[in-house]
């Protein structure tokens, strides 16, 4: 049985931990409000731009000389995967879900005979992939570190992907990220960025095309909008991931704070029982000694 001194030390240690987790929960909650607002504001814009460019792509998909961001390289051999994780832990299953989804995707593509390249974003994903797939990593990108995500980060990554595509370093690019649903739920999502997915059905394409009028022509618009769309989609996924990280961290720290409270209650009960037992034993010894005299 632990001594009273040991129990007091353990209670003090758990109380200190509870203060830390409670503070981290409040910080995550404050960051979550901003991150959630930014992610939700970006969704309609990113979705509308994706639909518009899919419409544009559908109208010209049979023409020659299309941009590689739309038509691809004509091959489906080398797949570049961009898993988005956080730089820091203490976020529940946030990073583990992305790592598991990425690993499953890698194995599925390899089973199909594809060549895999990895460009992880965030330290946690990079560290995980280095342990299992170090030979597939071409480079890694630092995450936001819990700070607000600037559009310049997405623009820089988009330009880098465009340059890699032009050099023939990959044929297909897919991002793996956590889509923010609510504080308690984030969904690991795979989204193909390059080449742009366009409708294959002429009826669907023409039906959606009735909502748009393009000026200037489709080809000129594609040349200018495709790079911008890539940056916008990357930015939207970064915002979703940032909101998901703060939501997962807030939930994890709330659970940790609750568990610490329960642990304190259990330790306090044990402490009181031990103290009571010690007092009882001392009284018995005193009474026994008095009777012996």
Swiss-Prot record:
Q: CDD domains, from UniProt?
A: F1-ATPase_gamma
Q: Where are the transmembrane segments?
A: none
Q: Which PROSITE patterns match?
A: ATPASE_GAMMA (PS00153)
- Family annotation (SUPFAM superfamilies): ATP synthase (F1-ATPase), gamma subunit (SSF52943)
What span is annotated as the signal peptide, if there is one?
Answer: none
Q: Does the entry annotate any disulfide bonds, and if so which pairs?
A: none
Instruction: Give the record's membrane topology.
Output: Peripheral membrane protein
Alphabetical list of HAMAP family matching this protein: ATP_synth_gamma_bact
The subunit field of the Swiss-Prot or TrEMBL record says: F-type ATPases have 2 components, CF(1) - the catalytic core - and CF(0) - the membrane proton channel. CF(1) has five subunits: alpha(3), beta(3), gamma(1), delta(1), epsilon(1). CF(0) has three main subunits: a, b and c.
Against NCBIfam families, the record matches this protein to: ATPsyn_F1gamma, PRK05621.1-4
Give the protein family. Belongs to the ATPase gamma chain family.
Protein name in UniProt: ATP synthase gamma chain
Native source organism of the sequence: Gluconacetobacter diazotrophicus (strain ATCC 49037 / DSM 5601 / CCUG 37298 / CIP 103539 / LMG 7603 / PAl5)
Gene designation per UniProt: atpG
């Amino acid at each position: 049985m632990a001594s009273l001194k040991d129990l007091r030390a353990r209670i003090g240690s758990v109380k200190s931990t509870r203060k830390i987790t409670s503070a981290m929960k409040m910080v995550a909650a404050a960051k979550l409000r901003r991150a959630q607002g930014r992610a939700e504001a970006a969704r309609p814009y990113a979705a509308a731009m994706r639909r518009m460019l899919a419409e544009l792509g559908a109208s010209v998909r049979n023409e020659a000389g299309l941009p590689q961001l739309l038509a691809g390289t004509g091959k489906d051999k080398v797949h570049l995967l961009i898993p988005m994780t956080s730089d820091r832990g203490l976020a529940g299953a946030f990073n583990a879900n992305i790592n598991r989804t990425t690993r499953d995707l890698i194995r599925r593509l390899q089973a199909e005979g594809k060549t895999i390249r990895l460009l992880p974003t965030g330290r946690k994903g990079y560290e995980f992939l280095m342990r299992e797939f170090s030979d597939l990593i071409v480079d890694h990108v630092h995450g936001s570190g819990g700070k607000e995500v600037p559009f310049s980060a997405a623009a820089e990554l988009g330009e880098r992907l465009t340059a890699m595509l032009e050099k023939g370093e990959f044929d297909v690019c897919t991002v793996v990220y956590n889509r923010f649903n609510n504080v308690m739920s984030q969904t690991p999502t795979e989204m193909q960025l390059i080449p742009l997915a366009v409708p294959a059905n002429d009826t669907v394409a023409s039906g959606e095309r009735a909502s748009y009028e393009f000026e200037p022509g489709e080809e000129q618009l594609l040349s200018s909008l495709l790079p911008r769309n890539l940056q916008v989609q990357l930015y939207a996924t970064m915002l979703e991931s940032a909101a998901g990280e703060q939501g997962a961290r807030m939930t994890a720290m709330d659970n940790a704070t609750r568990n610490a409270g329960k642990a304190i209650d259990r330790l306090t009960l044990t402490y009181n029982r031990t103290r009571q037992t010690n007092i009882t034993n001392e009284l018995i010894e005193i009474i026994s000694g008095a009777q012996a005299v």
